[in-house]
From Swiss-Prot:
The gene is groEL1. One of its GO terms (cellular component) is cytoplasm. Transmembrane segments: none annotated. Coiled coil: none annotated. CDD domains: GroEL (cd03344). It is found in: Cytoplasm. This is Chaperonin GroEL 1. Forms a cylinder of 14 subunits composed of two heptameric rings stacked back-to-back. Interacts with the co-chaperonin GroES. It catalyses: ATP + H2O + a folded polypeptide = ADP + phosphate + an unfolded polypeptide. It comes from Streptomyces albus G. Its EC number is 5.6.1.7. InterPro entries: Chaperonin_Cpn60_CS, Cpn60/GroEL, Cpn60/GroEL/TCP-1, GroEL-like_apical_dom_sf, GROEL-like_equatorial_sf, TCP-1-like_intermed_sf. Belongs to the chaperonin (HSP60) family. The lineage of its organism: Bacteria, Bacillati, Actinomycetota, Actinomycetes, Kitasatosporales.
Length: 540
């Protein structure tokens, strides 16, 4: 396939046009008075959203050179979303401003490499300043304020704060669609997995059709249990030791005479045991069984480690305060495992989350982490139409991410003002000279853009507001929702420092690379062949 090239100033201008097309589409959504964008979908209803990354993903430019610029900024939004989960619009606005200011200087003869150095140094200084001024989140009302600001809904803020309170910072909060109106919270304590009892005869509560085991022994087996001869020695030891203590068996499968013996003993009232299948498949099943073993203090019985069921003693069994088993689910509450072992396992899963590239793997690891660390909250969201439902779901997911980021690194004043105040550390150009000093100045000018557009979207003169905010003390700023100046943290207008920091760092990373670009290479569009078979008609 032939390629076509563009060089020098022409190339950079084409990239800038693409950057502007994407950023102009996204920046109308920033701030409490930002607008929405409607995205046409090939199938189903259109999507209405104010989520920067969702909009960015949909933008493709006709011109292949401009499209390169748009794709680069899309990368800014996506990366910020991956790291902080929110702040994608802020990142896009910053990238546009950095590109605009930077290219102006490159066109005037500044060295792109020196500009890049200056930009990188300035961003590092501003990031450090933001982290210094960050205030750790210590109570529920702060969490509610962060979530409410991101979701633009106070009730949702309080709901997320409650969910965070229940599951802790490692817990999982998922958003599901519901058929009813409004938003509800559903909390599952302990470790739950989606496998139920193997026989309905095992239930202890006929009315609710569930088996509740108080203070049971827990046997975890990696393979299938088919022969009662394998299980008998262990059952006898359990009866001798615990008398009436129930037993939960988690295995790949319990079948044949082993299952029928358990059921018969349960019906006769001689012994209470409940068998469930292990969740997941393959390596994931092994990992989840390992998690359960750590949580309950059990040892996984597996041929590969030389442990056989018929030789196992009571020391391989785990314990828990209570286990509830329904037709479809099993929940283990307060496992009897060693707290240090559980923390070690949590640290191991966190390390795996850091190192994985796959979103699917990351999601599954997060779920495992949550089950070990405390619990799972499901927020069910409903709305009048499918379009509104999707929009609310987007907002909720953003708000949860923002809240997590806030708990991690703390909060700064919101509404774009934290950046305006943080760039004051650049007033002496960090002691740089020449084009490097110009690079520092580029960051200083670009940092006011998020605040400017928050004000513009509220129908005000952007630069007038940014100048006024720059004169205020740290922590003070402009509240676009009320149109007043004041202490933003007190007013509940706060941003997670991780979101603001990631937005700036990712925007600068792409912008400084874009400034050092000299050539663009794109594929030559295929020429359409003229259709054959049409003769020339002549009129005489």
């Amino acid at each position: 396939m032939a390629k076509i090239l563009k060089f020098d100033e022409d190339a950079r201008r084409a990239l800038e046009r693409g950057v502007n097309q994407l950023a102009d589409t996204v920046k109308v959504t920033i701030g409490p008075k930002g607008r929405n964008v409607v995205i046409d979908k090939k199938f189903g209803a259109p999507t209405i959203t104010n989520d920067g990354v969702t909009i960015a993903r949909e933008v493709e430019c006709d011109d292949p050179y401009e499209n390169l610029g748009a794709q680069l900024v899309k990368e800014v939004a996506t990366k910020t979303n991956d790291i902080a989960g929110d702040g994608t619009t802020t990142a896009t606005v910053l990238a546009q401003a950095l590109v605009r200011e930077g290219l102006r200087n490159v066109a005037a003869g500044a060295s792109p490499a020196a500009l890049k150095k200056g930009i990188d140094a300035a961003v590092a200084a501003v990031s450090a300043e933001l982290l210094d001024t960050a205030r750790p989140i210590d109570d529920k009302s702060d969490i509610a304020a962060v979530a409410a600001l991101s979701a633009q809904d106070k009730q949702v803020g309080e709901l997320i704060a409650e969910a965070m309170d229940k599951v802790g910072k490692d817990g999982v909060i998922t958003v599901e669609e519901s058929n009813t109106f409004g938003v509800d919270l559903d909390f599952t304590e302990g470790m739950a997995f989606d496998k139920g009892y193997l026989s309905p005869y095992m239930v202890t509560d006929q009315e609710r059709m569930e088996a509740v085991l108080d203070d049971p022994y827990i046997l975890i087996h990696q393979g299938k249990i088919g022969s009662i001869q394998d299980l008998l020695p262990l059952l006898e030891k359990v009866i001798q030791a615990g008398g009436s203590k129930p037993l939960l068996i988690i295995a790949e499968d319990v079948e044949g005479e082993a299952l029928s013996t358990l059921v018969v003993n349960k019906i006769r009232g001689t012994f209470n045991a409940v068998a469930v299948k292990a969740p997941g498949f393959g390596d994931r099943r092994k990992a989840m069984l390992g998690d359960m073993a750590t949580l309950t203090g059990a040892t996984v019985i597996a041929e590969e480690v030389g442990l056989k069921l018929d030789q196992a003693g009571l020391d391989v069994l785990g314990t828990a305060r209570r286990v509830t088993v329904t037709k479809d689910d099993t929940t283990i509450v307060d496992g009897g495992g060693n707290a240090e072992d559980v923390q070690g396992r949590v640290a191991q899963i966190k390390a795996e989350i850091e190192s994985t590239d796959s979103d699917w793997d990351r999601e599954k690891l997060q779920e495992r982490l949550a089950k070990l660390a405390g619990g799972v909250c499901v927020i069910r969201v409903g709305a009048a139409t499918e379009v509104e439902l999707k929009e609310r779901k987007h907002r909720l997911e953003d708000a949860i991410s923002a809240t997590r980021a806030a708990v991690e690194e703390g909060i700064v004043s919101g509404g774009g003002s934290a950046l305006v105040h943080a760039v004051k550390v650049l007033d002496d150009n960090l002691g740089r000279t020449g084009d490097e000093a110009t690079g520092v100045a580029v960051v200083r000018r670009a940092a006011v853009e998020p605040l400017r557009w928050i004000a513009e979207n509220a129908g005000l003169e952007g630069y007038v507001i940014t100048t006024k905010v720059a004169e205020l003390d740290k922590g003070q700023g402009f509240n676009a929702a009320t149109g007043e100046y004041g202490d933003l943290v007190k007013a509940g207008v706060i941003d997670p420092v991780k979101v603001t920091r990631s937005a700036l760092e990712n925007a600068a990373s792409i912008a400084s690379l874009l400034l050092t670009t000299e050539t663009l290479v794109v594929e030559k569009p295929a020429e359409e062949e003229p259709e054959a078979g049409h003769g020339h008609g002549h009129s005489h």
